[in-house]
Amino acid sequence: MNAFQKKEISLDERQAKSTAWALTFADVVTLLLTFFVLLLVMLSDAENRLSTLIENLLDETYEEMTTGLAYDNISVDRETKGIKITITGNLFKSTSAEVDPKYYEVIHQIGKLIAKSDLMNIEELVEHKALLETFEQNGVSLNVEVRCEGHTDDAKLPPNSNYPSNWELSAARSLNLVRLMNKHAGMPEKYFSALGYGEFRPVIDVAKIDNFDEKQEARAKNRRVEIYLDAFFENIIQKQEKIEIDIKT
């Protein structure tokens, strides 16, 4: 009887030992889940802080540009996608993508204001380095972008034009403006991008205007260049994959 009891105890012990790993495994899984939840909360908090920081820096830059770009043919607006600087008037000669030299000073001023802004130099601000490093360690980078968008009116180009359509003309104009800004601002080219929309995103729909003078005035407003200053988060791995795809294509 005693031998039988010892055998039963021995089986119980073996069963207990055989399931002991499950309890340890469950504890490890619980700890890992807790760690990842805590990490997500910390990243979310850091992202909110950085988003608030970016918005504050954009607000400051907007105020500086509003004061520093007090020209009749330039408007500065604070939008959800950053700061928009709109240049109208005879920035370019008719059917040409060359910037009129009389606007060089204005472009120089725009470039310098952007280059000196805290947003453009955020990585050099000591008080924000720890926050940026937290993101970089988790595979996320902050990108600052200066995007130039060219727009023309709906008038057809003459047969002897250097450009087949307003699309190409608007793209060439925005690219030339970007080059000038890059030259005057002294910033790396990686911050800049140029787009051309032709006549397809007008401020005023001239098709609804019958009066000739009013139509010409509307077309003058549609001929414009918009410069956007913005910042956004980007996954470093996805960014690298995108660069590799662009290189291959």
Language-model-detected regions and their locations in the chain:
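Envelope-exposed proteins and targeting segments
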Residues: 70-72, 79-83, 87-90, 95, ...
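Short beta-strand elements
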Residues: 68-81, 121-136, 140-147
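Short amphipathic alpha-helical segments
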Residues: 49, 53-57, 61, 102, ...
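Periplasmic OmpA-like peptidoglycan-binding domain that tethers envelope proteins to the cell wall
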Residues: 99-101, 128-249
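Structured segments of extracytoplasmic/periplasmic soluble domains
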Residues: 60, 64, 68, 109-121, ...
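Short, solvent-exposed beta-strand/turn patches at coil↔beta or beta↔helix junctions
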Residues: 79-124, 155-164
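Short terminal targeting/anchoring segments
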Residues: 1-88
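Solvent-exposed residues in well-ordered beta-strands and their adjoining turns
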Residues: 38, 88, 115, 228-232
